[in-house]
């Protein structure tokens, strides 16, 4: 017998993935949310569910304390559905020539530019000589290499870097964010404070440079695109427009989960550039 909160698997529907029991009703039915199929109401006398326990039952989405609240939102488009939509656009997935030309190559080019202009050694030498203006010039050049940061937000960053004090603050905080030795959370928060000080505190600006410098572990946050992808998987993003560590930490957890799921579906993303591009491509209206 299964109960509310149990993790189960449908013996005849393995593609539905792991499910969590939302409710067992008095008339012998169970409402179950399956991670790849959404909510199903099933007569228990017709199915002998496999109960999942122990380490196998651990799941970053289903185990989140706010899962039940998110699971009750009506309508469900599954990750496998989104995968099919992506493959309609790019039949060869992340190796598709169209995908590489339209979505990946220009981001890789921006990463290469950042590593050329603001490598740790080059950045350190510029800081050591007090050449803060050149650091800002290079950072803005990297920002302008892609369309990831909205034009008005690029302008806001540029406008915030007019005084010597703001230019030096930004240069020092950006170096610490990318190459500092302290705990990353603290480096993140001090860079966020810098962006607030110069009135350029936007999530795109906040996450752009680490995303390009370290795409194996850091993610870019474009709010509406990311919120759509998180809602699709019922992930908890804890999104707030103000820059904060909780939202970014949830973003990293979600990005790792999504990457793992794409690997399990044989999509094999190389890094978070592919994962972010996938999120963009499956957002309604982006390729309609």
Q: Where does each model-flagged region fall?
A:
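Basic/aromatic-rich interaction segments and small domains that mediate binding to polyanionic partners
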Residues: 1-53
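N-terminal, helix-rich and Lys/Arg-enriched segments in bacterial and organellar proteins
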Residues: 9-11, 19-20, 209, 225-226, ...
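Short, flexible loop/turn elements at secondary-structure junctions
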Residues: 12, 211-214, 279
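An N-terminal alpha-helical hairpin/helix-loop-helix interaction module that forms a charged
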Residues: 29, 56-198, 216-288
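Helix-hairpin-helix
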Residues: 193-210
């Amino acid at each position: 017998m299964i109960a509310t909160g149990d993790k189960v698997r449908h013996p005849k529907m393995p593609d539905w993935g792991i499910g969590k029991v939302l409710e067992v009703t008095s008339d012998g039915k169970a409402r179950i949310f399956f991670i790849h199929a959404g909510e199903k109401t099933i007569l228990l006398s017709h199915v002998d569910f496999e109960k999942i326990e122990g380490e196998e039952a651990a799941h970053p989405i289903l185990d989140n304390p706010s899962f039940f609240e998110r699971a009750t939102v009506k309508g469900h488009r599954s990750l496998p559905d989104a995968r099919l939509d992506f493959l309609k656009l790019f039949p060869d997935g992340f190796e598709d020539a169209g995908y590489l030309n339209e979505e990946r190559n220009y981001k890789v080019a921006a990463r290469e530019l950042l590593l050329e202009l603001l490598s740790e050694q080059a950045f350190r030498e510029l800081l050591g000589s007090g050449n803060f203006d050149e650091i800002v010039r290079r950072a803005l050049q990297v920002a302008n290499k892609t369309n990831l940061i909205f034009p008005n937000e690029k302008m806001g960053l540029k406008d915030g870097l007019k005084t010597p004090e703001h230019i030096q603050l930004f240069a020092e905080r950006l170096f610490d964010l990318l190459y500092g030795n302290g705990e990353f959370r603290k480096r993140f928060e001090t860079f966020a404070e810098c962006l607030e000080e110069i009135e350029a505190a936007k999530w795109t600006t906040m996450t752009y440079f680490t995303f390009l410098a370290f795409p194996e572990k850091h993610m870019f946050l474009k709010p509406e695109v990311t919120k759509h992808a998180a809602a699709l998987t019922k992930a908890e993003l804890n999104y707030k427009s103000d820059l904060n560590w909780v939202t970014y930490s949830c973003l990293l957890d979600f990005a790792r989960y999504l990457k793992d799921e794409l690997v399990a579906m044989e999509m094999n993303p190389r890094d978070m550039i592919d994962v972010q591009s996938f999120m963009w491509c499956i957002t309604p209206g982006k390729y309609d």
